[in-house]
Amino acid sequence: MLTNKEIRELLPHRYPFLLVDKVIELEPGKKVVAVKNVSANEPFFQGHFPEYPIMPGVLIVEALAQAAGIAVAVLEDNKGKLGVFAGIEAMKFKNQVMPGDVLTLEAEILVSKLGVTKAKVKASVDGKVAAEGEIKFAMTKA
């Protein structure tokens, strides 16, 4: 388990773009389960959409990428490195994420070679899948 403070030591993201609140399960280099508490005060809800607030899909994908990044950022070889997107594959959006939801972020590292990591990711609310797919990211010197 990682606290928000420990997450901020691993990721360079800060409010309003840090989208992982805590890590509840971590197998370094293999798997992570994290949580994003979706507040009605999120700045993106002002415009997406004021009368029917929905968390933008691209931000769900970003939250998944941040969670997956934590799974490899904790490895000694990646200390001080920055994870940057290299690809999004077969991402499907199945349910909406709204204010008050607790978004569970899961990432399983499939392969990591030549500095590029591929992960299977899933975001869910109360056991219902909101989004799932595969992402790729590269760990680079910051």
Swiss-Prot record:
NCBIfam families: fabZ (TIGR01750), PRK00006.1 (NF000582). The gene is fabZ. One of its GO terms (cellular component) is membrane. GO terms for molecular function: (3R)-hydroxyacyl-[acyl-carrier-protein] dehydratase activity. Its main location: cytoplasm. This is 3-hydroxyacyl-[acyl-carrier-protein] dehydratase FabZ. It comes from Ruminiclostridium cellulolyticum (strain ATCC 35319 / DSM 5812 / JCM 6584 / H10). It is an enzyme of class 4 (lyase). The active site is at residue 48.
